[in-house]
């Protein structure tokens, strides 16, 4: 079980799907709705240092209840709109609980995996729209 983590197997492992076996396990690392996400590829050092695992997301640094107290729906929407990110949500809580300020810096999280040879950065995905149910 990988609590708080996801597979980052290197190339040439039987457990990596055949179409990715020459590259390594694709790893998706989501950030916040305002910062984007990363695509990585698992590397050999992951097997020696982290049991073939890496972070599965930026991770929260603020509780949902604190985010509800500290942020308003309008300020989160304005912040995203100022970055050119369209936001559609059915609820106020869906907006404020997921404010980008509630999450760690996804770039810093990914850089740790990259620098330690656990997973290699392939592409950064930049948000253009967010839909919260």
Predicted feature residues:
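Domain-length cofactor-binding catalytic modules of enzymes
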Residues: 1-133
């Amino acid at each position: 079980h990988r609590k708080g983590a996801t597979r980052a197997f290197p190339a040439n492992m039987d457990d990596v799907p055949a179409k990715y076996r020459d590259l390594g396990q694709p790893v998706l690392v989501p950030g916040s709705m305002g910062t984007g996400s990363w695509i990585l590829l698992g590397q050999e050092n992951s097997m020696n240092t982290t049991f073939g695992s890496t972070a599965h997301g930026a991770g929260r640094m603020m509780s949902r209840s604190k985010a509800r107290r500290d942020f308003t729906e309008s300020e989160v929407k304005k912040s995203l709109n100022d970055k050119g990110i369209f936001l559609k949500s059915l609820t106020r809580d869906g907006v404020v609980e997921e404010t980008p300020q509630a999450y760690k810096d996804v770039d810093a999280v990914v850089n740790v995996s990259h620098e330690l040879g656990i997973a290699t950065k392939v592409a950064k995905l930049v948000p253009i729209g967010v839909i919260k149910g």
